[in-house]
Amino acid sequence: TKKKALMQQQLGGFFRTELTKAFGPEPEPATLPIDRAYLKTANLSAVAFTECTVTDFHEGEHKGRRFSAANVELRRTVEEKSGPDNDNWMTRTETLFRGIVVRCKDICDPALDIALNDMFQERKKDDITDPAAFRKYFAAHTADGREVNDLVTPQLRDLVQKLEASSGSAKLCGLILRDGDLTLALNTRYVFAGIPEELDLRDIDGIRKWFTASLTGMGNLLDLITESPALTGAAE
């Protein structure tokens, strides 16, 4: 957007400095890309997407652990019959996911192989403590597609709840623990390394504060993930 270009022009230097201060220099090329090709193979959404937008991708280190993150939107086009006699086809675009995708390297037990996907059921935040309820809202699979609901430990359920409690608008879309790495797709209004649309461009101080806070927010999220006992693979 024009607004974004203008902001980059004015504050690009500040943004880069803050990012490097928070997460170190950006590797070239990226070792943990978040792009269309990766999102297609990762299957973070239970419903396949046809279009995606990735913005503010950054890779770096937090407390010695390599990670990458980006703001992502996944959409699909749906064809529906419409008109008085249902004889017209109408195409509409549906947003499947809007939030952040985070990849963490060498963060969990390499023996773990589990992918959790939100099943797109309506639910309230507090519905997922109970194993039976959790099963209704999330499907668990291995890399080769086997269903592994029994491998969902209390620790893993607890991690999902903590992720959803991390911000008022957070809702898990997908979480993958595989080959020692973790990938997270979290629906949220939180914007990583960026600022929300509605911020006034003339408020330079406000933009700076917001940007820095978004980096701190990512650090907190990474701490929450790293500290989870779910990553060691040991059930109680």
What are these regions (language model features)?
Residues 1-5:
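Alpha-helical transmembrane spans
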Residues 17, 21-23, 29-75, 80-84, ...:
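Charged, low-complexity intrinsically disordered regions
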Residues 12:
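Nuclease catalytic cores
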Residues 9:
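GGW-centered surface loops in extracellular recognition modules
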